[in-house]
Every structure is written in C-alpha cells, then in structure tokens.
From Swiss-Prot:
Annotated family: Belongs to the bacterial ribosomal protein bL12 family.
Key word Ribonucleoprotein present: yes
Originating organism: Pseudoalteromonas translucida (strain TAC 125)
Zinc-finger listed as a keyword: no
A Pfam family this chain is assigned to: Ribosomal_L12
InterPro entries the UniProt entry points to: Ribosomal_bL12, Ribosomal_bL12_C, Ribosomal_bL12_C/ClpS-like, Ribosomal_bL12_oligo, Ribosomal_bL12_oligo_N_sf
Alphabetical keyword list: Ribonucleoprotein, Ribosomal protein
GO cellular component: a single term: cytosolic large ribosomal subunit
Chain's gene name: rplL
Name of this protein: Large ribosomal subunit protein bL12
Entry-linked SUPFAM superfamilies: ClpS-like, Ribosomal protein L7/12, oligomerisation (N-terminal) domain
Length: 120
C-alpha cells in the first residue's frame, strides 16, 4: 500500500512539535542530510533594498477629531462624509504606495492636527 503526500502531510500536521523535531532528526540520520538552510549554492547576499513605497495609516483621531477629519480631507480630497468615515474607522490607511517624502509630510500634517499616525 502506497501512502500519498497528502496523507503524510496530514499525519505531520497532527503531530506535536516535539514529535516533528524527532521525525526531522530521524530523517536526517536515515538520509544523511541536514534540515538547516544552506547558503552553499546561493549567491552572495545582496544589500537590503530600501523601501520606496510607504503607507500612511491613521491609528486614531486623537483628542481633536474635527481637525483630524479636516487634515484627512485636505490630504486625500475626500468629501466630508467620506473623510469622517475614514477617521472613525481607524486604524485605516489614509494613502498607500506613496514616496517616503510624501508619507512623512502627510504624517506630519495629520500629527499636527492631533491624529495618531503610523508610516509603514
């Protein structure tokens, strides 16, 4: 009787962490391999790319909700109703995929209006 890959994966999924570790050790011994990630065949590590697109997330309206709504409205061009809904739905993205400079400027404007902001 042949065991399918799905049956093997299901059996492993039901195992405890300690049982999985023991299984891996047994497989390493039986097949003469290691489960450690090797860097032998990989190219030299490249420098980490600097992030070029940022998201400005409104995490809270702060003490002055009206100022936060005005700041969101001026930054996004939304109508009053939409800007109010966005502020009340915090945490929510205000703008996504913008440059670092634009994200920092928007975060500064919103923070000055009393809103709580996060740049990701």
């Amino acid at each position: 009787m042949s065991v399918s890959k799905d049956q093997i994966l299901d059996a492993i999924a039901e195992m405890s962490v300690m049982d999985v570790v023991a299984l891996i050790e047994a497989m390493e011994e039986k097949f003469g391999v290691t489960a450690a990630a090797g860097m032998v065949a990989g190219p030299a590590a490249e420098a980490v790319e600097e992030k070029t697109e940022f998201d400005v997330i409104l995490t809270g309206a702060g003490a002055n909700k009206v100022s936060a709504i005005k700041a969101v409205r001026s930054a996004t061009g939304l109508g009053l109703k939409e800007a109010k809904a966005l502020v009340e739905a915090a945490p929510t993205p205000v703008k996504e995929g913008i440059s670092k400079e634009e994200a920092e400027a928007l975060a500064k404007d919103l923070t000055e209006a009393g809103a709580e902001v996060e740049v990701k």
